[in-house]
Amino acid sequence: MAFRENVLEILEEITETEEVVQNTNIKLFDEGLLDSMATVQLLIEIEEKLDITVPVSEFDRDEWATPEMIITQLEALK
């Protein structure tokens, strides 16, 4: 499975909706699909499944607002 699909699969699991796959520009926080607890869960899943550690200093909610932005940020950290 490609990196992009892996990230979207993780997001779909965390948010419990396919909407994140269908609309990769959806504002996850504004739509209530991610909150602080879900964000922690997301970062743990990313580390476990993709072997990418996201330093807390690198996490800026404004830069991680959509699935597309998350994919871009993670590609930079690979």
Curated annotation (Swiss-Prot):
Pathway: Cell wall biogenesis; lipoteichoic acid biosynthesis
PTM description: 4'-phosphopantetheine is transferred from CoA to a specific serine of apo-DCP.
SUPFAM superfamilies xrefs: ACP-like
Role according to the record: Carrier protein involved in the D-alanylation of lipoteichoic acid (LTA). The loading of thioester-linked D-alanine onto DltC is catalyzed by D-alanine--D-alanyl carrier protein ligase DltA. The DltC-carried D-alanyl group is further transferred to cell membrane phosphatidylglycerol (PG) by forming an ester bond, probably catalyzed by DltD. D-alanylation of LTA plays an important role in modulating the properties of the cell wall in Gram-positive bacteria, influencing the net charge of the cell wall.
Subcellular location: Cytoplasm
Source domain of life: Bacteria
Keywords: Cell wall biogenesis/degradation, Cytoplasm, Phosphopantetheine, Phosphoprotein
One GO cellular component term: cytoplasm
Family affiliation: Belongs to the DltC family.
Entry coiled-coil feature ranges: none
Boundaries of every Carrier domain copy: 1-78
Native organism: Listeria welshimeri serovar 6b (strain ATCC 35897 / DSM 20650 / CCUG 15529 / CIP 8149 / NCTC 11857 / SLCC 5334 / V8)
Record has GTP-binding as a keyword: no
GO annotation, biological process: cell wall organization; lipoteichoic acid biosynthetic process
InterPro entries named in the record: ACP-like_sf, DltC, PP-bd_ACP
In-chain residues carrying the UniProt-annotated modification O-(pantetheine 4'-phosphoryl)serine: 36
The keyword Repressor is annotated on this UniProt entry: no
Protein name: D-alanyl carrier protein
GO MF term list: D-alanyl carrier activity
A family per Pfam: PP-binding
Principal cellular location given in the protein's record: cytoplasm
